[in-house]
Amino acid sequence: MQFVSTRPQPQQLGIQGLGLDSGSWSWAQALPPEEVCHQEPALRGEMAEGMPPMQAQEWDMDARRPMPFQFPPFPDRAPVFPDRMMREPQLPTAEISLWTVVAAIQAVERKVDAQASQLLNLEGRTGTAEKKLADCEKTAVEFGNHMESKWAVLGTLLQEYGLLQRRLENLENLLRNRNFWVLRLPPGSKGEAPKVPVTFVDIAVYFSEDEWKNLDEWQKELYNNLVKENYKTLMSLDAEGSVPKPDAPVQAEPREEPCVWEQRHPEEREIPMDPEAGAEPLVPAQDASSQVKREDTLCVRGQRGLEERAIPTESITDSPISAQDLLSRIKQEEHQCVWDQQDLADRDIPTDPNSESLISAHDILSWIKQEEQPYPWGPRDSMDGELGLDSGPSDSLLMVKNPPPAPPQPQPQPQPPQPQLQSQPQPQSLPPIAVAENPGGPPSRGLLDDGFQVLPGERGSGEAPPGGDRSTGGGGGDGGGGGGGAEAGTGAGGGCGSCCPGGLRRSLLLHGARSKPYSCPECGKSFGVRKSLIIHHRSHTKERPYECAECEKSFNCHSGLIRHQMTHRGERPYKCSECEKTYSRKEHLQNHQRLHTGERPFQCALCGKSFIRKQNLLKHQRIHTGERPYTCGECGKSFRYKESLKDHLRVHSGGPGPGAPRQLPPPPERD
């Protein structure tokens, strides 16, 4: 290997002139540092070719002899160039090690960052899992509380079921013994005595046999529909829970009942109680009447429709039936009642035989079957005697007493054949049950000569009819005086002349018009029954006597409280058979079922448009009549719908106007 150098000799550079010893100079020192760094790798590469490793590291000075210039020998000092060449290869190794350490440190830092991010992610997931676990625990606690409430309701239902079974057994035993009924008024929720007794007479309608024959077919159909409607509303009484405790007896007041269309002699006013015997023991008329007419409370009927019981209504006339048939019919009605034994002597029964009047068995059935709900009739002249509708934990009491035996009396004269009830054949016709009226003095409700009665609310002030100072027991022959009856009915102010001597109740059936004798003195709205007027009057007085024990929400009627309590218990007893939806009220289910059947029974007579609900028809009719019943109290502007008035009131109150979105009302078929 030969090196050709173009550099000047040390003598040319003036080494001696610089004062440098020639023995200490090397050619590598004469080069700039940067050239030495660049040429050293090349030199090392050339030296490594064809030489062993050890020989490449040692410099053989003899190998340089062919070179054009040679360094002068320096015997006293080792050459610098070979030593420098041996030390230089160690520097890249140190540099490579430093960069490796830095790269390793950076890799470790990146791994630490990745582990830190994963740790943060795990912490977040742990927090989410803890929240879900807390929600699950809360849900489990709520579910446990819900199950406890359901178990409590189930226990209450089982207890009530046991009570109903015992009442039914008592009823069957009493009916088997052929006892009779005395209805009683239920006490209040706190056990207080009721204020006013109530009878079935206020909603009953009576016809004689001849008048029934003179009625047209549509009038008879109207009568049947009224009876069915009353009976259907009666089925909902069991949900009222208006049943007092048996240990809370209530004294009843004597009430007057309507007389029948035939007046009989006192010796004929008895009814045989045992049709199997020829000479049967007879019951005094006043005893039977005292047990029938003191109807102070309600009997809770079983929830069965009129169609299922096949009770005929079109053939019900004033035909008398035996007490046994009457009791068997009552038993078929499956009335679930609680009986309370009370001494007959404690009831102040009138004993004057001259104060008796006759009433047919049909009238008794009418009183029993047409009772809708606890009607707060109160006194006839005012609303002060409002019926307390607060109900206790048990059902209505029905007082039962065996009629005491009476002294033998002559057999009643045979009656002409009369049509019988269709529910069961009548082997014989017996005289009507005798009922006593108020002894000594004119009756508080006028009785007409033809046997019809002016019902409460049809006379206005409740006074006796003109010339009506005669008693019901005497002075009237068989049939009475028709002219006097017409005069009394006209003078009462509730009838429509000689065609309707019975007053507004008779006019309802003869002319098909619904009478509403009870008017509100404040707003003038009329009602057909006194109870509706009393409940309506509470809207003016802001009276809400029925309060929920759970949420303290109050209501103005007892039925509203009962429906509200069903929401606490989660009761939805009415279920659609097609879509399985359930409802808490029967009318909501009926409206919903019309969606399946497509029935729209309420049709506008002017434009022919039909509706599912009656309320929608009434709202629609305001378009034709121009009625705007909702008036703003601030600006006097009137509106057709209540929702429009609410939107308008928001303008006065500073809330969102009519254009603002509002929450949609629930579907019509839901609660």
Curated annotation (Swiss-Prot):
Tissues in which the UniProt entry reports expression: Ubiquitous.
Gene that specifies this protein: ZNF282
Single GO MF descriptor: sequence-specific double-stranded DNA binding
Zinc finger (C2H2-type): 518-540, 546-568, 574-596, 602-624, 630-652
Composition skew (Gly residues), residue ranges: 470-486
Record protein name field: Zinc finger protein 282
Any one Gene Ontology BP term: regulation of DNA-templated transcription
Source organism: Homo sapiens (Human)
Domain KRAB: 198-271
